[in-house]
Amino acid sequence: MPLRPARCYTHFSGPPYTRREYIHGVPPPKITRFEMGNREMMEKWEIKGELVMLEAGQIRHNALEAARIAVNKYLATTIGDKNFYFRIRVYPHHVIRENKMMAFAGADRLQDGMRQAFGKPVGTAARVYPGTVVLEVWARKGDEENVKEALRRGASKFPLPSRIVIRTRGAQAS
């Protein structure tokens, strides 16, 4: 069964479905690393770039992993492996369910589906709200444009609108 489009899971209603001890067969999240780069130098770097969400919604675990790969690869090739610290600030706790349906020609004659069907677990997602910081990059002064471009590439992997905020140490957001 192929992966459904992100629009099927972007918006949510109701409480999060997170109690894994009661849920059987939850697939593990694709994203396993949440911190990359040089953590020891984080306290010395002057700028911090943040990707802030503008709407409430869900970001699937494979979108988080795609954004992680895109941001990390761009920063490692442009400013070097040891010249940044990158962190993902959300975790995909919410379990996504899907009521599997047959999707071929003539399937409508074979099934009617079921109203309010509960579905089986197919993945996980992180729930975000307006103002939630999803990605965070620390770097040296002078690398602002590279940090902005990396966060822009990461934002393109998410189904929700977002804003890039660059902060300098000891100053307000710009």
Swiss-Prot record:
GO biological process: translation
Record's keyword annotation contains Ribonucleoprotein: yes
Top-level lineage group: Archaea
Signal peptide segment: none
Short name of one Pfam family: Ribosomal_L16
One example GO MF annotation: structural constituent of ribosome
Keywords: Ribonucleoprotein, Ribosomal protein
GO CC aspect terms: ribonucleoprotein complex; ribosome
CDD domains reported in the protein's UniProt record: Ribosomal_L16_L10e
PANTHER family: 60S RIBOSOMAL PROTEIN L10
Family named by the database record: Belongs to the universal ribosomal protein uL16 family.
Protein name: Large ribosomal subunit protein uL16
Species name: Aeropyrum pernix (strain ATCC 700893 / DSM 11879 / JCM 9820 / NBRC 100138 / K1)
